[in-house]
């Protein structure tokens, strides 16, 4: 076959790909359901540590700052750095396979946390959890984008993002129920493992099911990749040519202002949210004298219900605005939610009564979650298909390094080194959350105009590739 004939064949394949209808809605929503289920498990495994602070500190002699390191930076560094090569892999290889292997991997390391006998061992296991979970979201965002047309993507991605809050809420509820058990019981002698504390058993229980449940990903079909530049027939199956890294870097440079405002703006909202979710349970234990079980159930319900409704509402609002001609709806929804958070997010740490703090946490949680379905949807909206996995991985790199990596740690360090009083954790939450939202609001506002220019640039890129 001549080079010109080959080029024509590839061009025809690409056009056919663009014209083919999206998969049927019932199956597309089934795929979102499976991905959300996997995401729920990832957040249960990620967040369960936050409800076991007291027994872990008791048995391993770990300070608040080191607990902040375990719940945040130790996980986030590996999650973020491995996300970029795994996101690049998701742009050309089997996305369902990447997710399935990652699911089994992080589940094994979650269970491995139950084998930890000291801080270093627990640190290493948390790093492994981070590596495994890095496989999930870049591939999931890419799959969802190829299953849904643009006017439905923000809702679909927001429903997937519900997994954050359902998983976190379940982790709090389940963790709260087992925290009393984990705190009170003596060590057990288990076969093979030896002396085991009840909090270690909790890690076994939440980690091991995922090893088998990873097989569920093989009920998901790989959809046709839309907007790819080159599709070659290999044994009757489509294959995707990976976009050279230099082209990806060049495209990102051309849109640098959009990425700066978007990624850092949403990362600071994540910084506030992760800091709050890590230390709100401890705040209620120290400030109001609640048990871990009581706050786990109360805050877990808030996260599972209010935060889940918030992220879906954000996506639905963005799609509603998009259908009515708002091209920047995904960014504007994040901006609006950030502004509306202030009266509630600044008030709940100052309440002298626990009941008032709980009441204010409901709208604060709703508004804090609303941006996190539209944020990844904005990335899919502005990036060419062959670069979406990598752009999503970079977004997750920034959001999780700043948010998950530093949020819990900065709250803990503010308590340990600024106030030097464990009872002042509520003031740490107030200061960290308020400053993060102020800077985020400014960045998202500034980023709207560059975002619109990026959408125009994508149209030009698509025309040039036709």
Language model regions located:
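Conserved MFS/SLC helix-loop-helix module at the cytosolic interface between two early adjacent transmembrane helices
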Residues: 81-119
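Juxtamembrane intracellular "pre-TM" segments in multi-pass secondary transporters
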Residues: 16-24, 223-261, 287
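Helix-loop-helix hairpin linking two adjacent transmembrane segments in secondary transporters
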Residues: 160, 164-222
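Extracellular/periplasmic helix-loop-helix junction of adjacent transmembrane segments
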Residues: 52-81
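Structural signature of the two symmetry-related core transmembrane helices
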Residues: 97-111, 328-345
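Helix-breaking motifs and short loop linkers at transmembrane-helix boundaries and internal kinks
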Residues: 61, 94, 115-121, 149, ...
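Extracytoplasmic gate region of multi-pass secondary transporters
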Residues: 49-50, 255-311, 369-372, 376, ...
């Amino acid at each position: 076959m001549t080079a010109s004939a080959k080029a024509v064949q590839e061009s025809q394949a690409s056009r056919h790909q663009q014209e083919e209808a999206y998969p049927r809605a019932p199956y597309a929503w089934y795929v979102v359901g499976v991905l959300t289920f996997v995401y729920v498990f990832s957040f249960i495994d990620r967040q369960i540590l936050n409800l076991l602070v007291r027994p872990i500190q008791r048995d391993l002699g770990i300070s608040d700052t080191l607990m902040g390191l375990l719940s945040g930076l130790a996980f986030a560094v590996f999650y973020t750095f491995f996300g970029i090569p795994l996101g690049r892999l998701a742009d050309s290889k089997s996305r369902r396979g990447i997710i399935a292997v990652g699911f089994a991997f992080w589940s094994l390391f979650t269970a491995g946390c139950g084998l930890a006998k000291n801080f270093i061992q627990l640190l290493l296991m948390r790093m492994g959890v981070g590596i495994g979970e890095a496989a999930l979201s870049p591939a999931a965002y890419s799959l969802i984008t190829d299953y849904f047309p643009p006017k439905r993507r923000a809702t679909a991605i927001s429903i997937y993002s519900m997994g954050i809050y359902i998983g976190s809420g379940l982790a709090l509820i389940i963790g709260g129920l087992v925290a009393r058990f984990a705190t009170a019981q003596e060590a057990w002698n288990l076969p093979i493992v030896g002396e085991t504390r009840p909090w270690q058993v909790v890690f076994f229980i939440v980690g091991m099911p995922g090893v088998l449940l990873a097989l569920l990903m093989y009920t998901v079909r790989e959809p046709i990749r839309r907007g790819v530049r080159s599709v070659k027939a290999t044994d009757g199956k489509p294959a995707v040519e990976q976009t050279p890294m230099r082209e990806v870097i060049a495209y990102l440079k051309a849109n640098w202002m959009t990425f700066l405002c978007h990624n850092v703006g949403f990362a600071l909202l994540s910084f506030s949210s992760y800091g709050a979710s890590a230390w709100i349970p401890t705040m209620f234990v120290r400030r109001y004298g609640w048990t871990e079980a009581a706050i786990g159930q109360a805050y877990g319900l808030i996260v599972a219900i209010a935060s889940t409704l918030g992220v879906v509402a954000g996506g639905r609002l963005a799609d509603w605005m998009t259908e009515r001609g708002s091209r920047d709806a995904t960014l504007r929804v994040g901006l609006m939610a950030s502004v509306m958070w202030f009266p509630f997010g600044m008030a709940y740490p100052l309440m002298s009564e626990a009941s008032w703090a709980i009441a204010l946490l409901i709208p604060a949680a709703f508004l804090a979650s609303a941006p996190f379905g539209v944020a990844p949807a904005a990335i899919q909206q502005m990036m060419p298909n062959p670069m979406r996995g990598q752009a999503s991985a970079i977004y997750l790199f920034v959001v999780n390094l700043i948010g998950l990596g530093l949020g819990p740690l900065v709250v803990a360090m503010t308590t340990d080194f600024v106030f030097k009083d464990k009872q002042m954790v509520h003031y740490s939450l107030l200061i960290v959350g308020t400053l993060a939202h102020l800077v985020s609001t400014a960045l998202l506002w500034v980023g709207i105009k560059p975002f619109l220019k990026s959408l125009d640039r994508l149209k030009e890129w698509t025309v040039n590739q036709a």
